[in-house]
């Protein structure tokens, strides 16, 4: 699950604080908070709730820096671990010396290790943190107690020899080859084949429901059919099945989606092509249900027809959730030569979200889309490859888990979904360092074969151009197809272009200036690659470097060529610099007013161009546009209202100003209360982008003494964070009910939250139950749209790389993210403050209706906030309340929950958004997560060169914000004509409890835990 950034540190701190308590001191609310966090962790997703509950009682939290050794090979273990964040290297040495240890794999989020503490066998490997990592630790005595009590639950979850394998062999070492299923290398799976030996119960049931529904509603679809003189018994036609499915439910939006849903049945063998030759296709092909494989298959009884009517929509919802994965597997099982352009695009989109591939360039990912093979294995215990064998493939786990086994040492670790293995043997051309054994049934992998892997690397290198100076690379370009297929002149060869992979800032700028197309209009010239440079240059070439460089390029004169050639070069050079400056100024807009260097550059540049235009007629056509931009920015900067705009105290997002909401700028001033230990406060007036050091100075001036002062962020739950002196724009980073405190360092432990931070004690159900759900959703969307519109794209960049590195504010983004948390906690607060059961049921219905209307208005941010509020443990545990919710609303909620399913990197949400046209308000925390994923998975500099491929990927994500806002939000005419000042005021001034512990306590008082 994704949480908005503004709440992340607070919620993290809260559950960590609970884990830091001694087990005997943990309350039921503490355990609830820990349980909520752990059930989202992959390592625990298959754990029985009772077992996970016990882990919450005895586990400890560890936060380790990069390079820390947890234990060494040969040590006797004392703890079991699960990875919550970060990654760790598994190193093995044949001599037990750490000097010659080889890294055999990496443990990612969700992996667990250390089961050897059950019988005190020595550790089989050395474990070292690869990056800053968070772990859950369970001490040996507690882990043994869990094993004794919950052995039946844990046997299938731990690595052998403690876990249970289907083969029944002793998995402490590699099973004998004669007795263990081995993989036949390079046998491609045909898409028509099933991927399971036995269909799952739920897919069998789904097939039965669909067959009965067809026989009940359209019996003519299942009949004997003749084709080429051959009769096929009791079968259906692919196109007719797609038509029928689209008519049955609104949750099927396209024929492609329906194909994926039928493919789910085909993969399990519940539906089959009559000759076992084809995967499911929207064509005149014959398919037969499993029940119809037998002679005289029975028709559904009246009772079965009734059951089918009741279960059909739930079945459709289930298949719609499973369909995208089945469709992806179907594509990956096609021979690479048969994959269409659309197929390759679908695979490429999937690869963007696989952490093991995050460091690879776009070109390599696109090449991989063409060669990746889907591989599945039905039986646990199958050996994928053996230690010492030649490395022929690289694997990424899509589903399931594997054990990494070394001769004489047994299982050294377990790898899970998203982890990869086998790449080192390909890169180093070395034998396999370990054996890989399937840990469970039905494991799915992506496989890259060695020859394809090496060919891709060779092709990339062959298409790479390196510009060197003094024997050092200064610019690395990659040759790629230009995108426009054949030219109008009949040339069938695709044109090539060069994209920047890496380089020095100066050479990257020089390249983009040289490649600007002067014949294009300004709109056409906003080529996305140049746009990437303009958006991202602040990371590697701040304006203090860019502006002088642009001046130097503008005045540059060639040293060679005829006089005419020199004049032509100089003119075109000037025009290109002007073009880039126009785009740069358009992108930055009002933000330039806060940058003295940029303002001075613009004015001087305009004077230079004006002077040149008198002598060079060709520059005159660009002058008016430059003049317009410079004047507009200069006049805005000098306007009286821009000089010192005082913002609202405490940044209440529900500001009730009548005029249109204006973006907050770093130079705007804020009146802000900073509290002392005794809860008195002093009010300071400082710019929004002020650093903590300057805040301390302002507070010290008011208090008369500032020696040893620190500034502390205090949440309503009492979590305290000391702010660093170079932190900037901290006012908007507070949690909803958070406050700033100033105190000497020795008073830090004595700080306590203000009573007002606790939030309301009475709900507002009496007020908003009278308001229409549609009116509430509409006014929420109007307000969310105002907040979203104020977020500048560059704030996303500052947020990702750290605003302190730019000394810039991200106030508008902070407030928009805080709004997400505000709505989420509003839902939980209102339900937990409602003591009457029947009223709580009405509240659930109300919130589900509001969420549905937000979805209609394409306000996905509020939609997800409401759904996440309803799934908060303080609400989801209210079994009596949920039991009384009508089944219609339960179905709506189940459908909404399926959209926020985090599996496969929130694929359900991504597919939904891909179908929507702007304007829309996105699920902002996920967009932030995507940018952070790219940032943390790729270095900013490689060999002292800017990694421009990383810049391009981050800019591409940030640019989606521009796309979502590319059309104005047109108010609903029926809503806009209503005068709903009361609704407008209500949604802008939500009063919430944001302390999860308090909410859990209230929830337990409403419905105590059942014995």
UniProtKB/Swiss-Prot annotation:
Species: Homo sapiens (Human)
Subcellular location: Cytoplasm; Membrane
UniProt comment concerning the protein's domains: The N-terminal nucleotide phosphate binding region cAMP 1 has a much lower affinity for cAMP as compared to cAMP 2. The DEP domain is involved in membrane localization independent from regulation by cAMP.
Record gene name: RAPGEF4
GO process annotations (BP): adaptive immune response; adenylate cyclase-activating G protein-coupled receptor signaling pathway; calcium-ion regulated exocytosis; G protein-coupled receptor signaling pathway; insulin secretion; positive regulation of insulin secretion; Ras protein signal transduction; regulation of exocytosis
Signal peptide range in chain numbering: none
Tissue: Predominantly expressed in brain and adrenal gland. Isoform 2 is expressed in liver. Isoform 1 is expressed in liver at very low levels.
Role summary: Guanine nucleotide exchange factor (GEF) for RAP1A, RAP1B and RAP2A small GTPases that is activated by binding cAMP. Seems not to activate RAB3A. Involved in cAMP-dependent, PKA-independent exocytosis through interaction with RIMS2.
Location of the Ras-GEF domain: 772-1009
Subunit description: Interacts with RIMS1 and RIMS2. Probably part of a complex with RIMS2 and GTP-activated RAB3A.
Cellular component, GO annotation: cytosol; hippocampal mossy fiber to CA3 synapse; membrane; plasma membrane
Pfam families xref list: cNMP_binding, DEP, RasGEF, RasGEF_N
Keywords attached to this entry: cAMP, cAMP-binding, Cytoplasm, Exocytosis, Guanine-nucleotide releasing factor, Membrane, Nucleotide-binding, Repeat
Protein residues bound to 3',5'-cyclic AMP: 422-425, 432-433
Protein's name according to its UniProt entry: Rap guanine nucleotide exchange factor 4
Membrane topology: Peripheral membrane protein
Entries under SMART domains matching the protein: cNMP, DEP, RasGEF, RasGEFN
InterPro entries xref list: cNMP-bd_dom, cNMP-bd_dom_sf, DEP_dom, Ras-like_GEF, Ras-like_Gua-exchang_fac_N, Ras_G-nucl-exch_fac_CS, Ras_GEF_dom_sf, RASGEF_cat_dom
Main location per the UniProt record: cytoplasm
Domain DEP per the UniProt entry, residue ranges: 216-291
Record-annotated N-terminal Ras-GEF domain positions: 496-634
GO molecular function: cAMP binding; guanyl-nucleotide exchange factor activity; protein-macromolecule adaptor activity; small GTPase binding
